[in-house]
Amino acid sequence: DRINDAVYDMIEANIRNYAGEKKHLLITGMAADAPMERVSGKLNADLSEFNLETGRDMISRAAVRRQLAECDGIVLVEEKGVSRYSLVQQELELAKDMGIEVLGVIVV
C-alpha cells in the first residue's frame, strides 16, 4: 500500500473535521477494486463512529448512485494512472447536482 500510517492518520483527521454532523458517508471513486478495498477497510476500522459505505464507480453503476443518494457526503478514492480527470470531474458534478458534499479525495 502506498499510503503509510501517518498519511492515514491525517486522512482520518480530515474526514472527522470536514464531516461535521455528516455521519453517513460513501467511499467511492474510480480506483481499482484492490486499492479501493484497502482504503475503505482501513477507514472503516478507524472511523467507527461513521456509517461508511463503499461503492466503486458512481458514473456507470446505478447501484452506487442509489448509495450516493442515501449518503450525507462522499470521499473519492482515485488511482494514479487509472482515474481520468474527465471522470473525476463528472463525479464532482454529480455530487454537486445531488447536493452531496465531497469531503475529500484520496489518491493512491
Which functions belong to the PLM regions below?
Residues D1-V108:
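P-loop NTP-binding module
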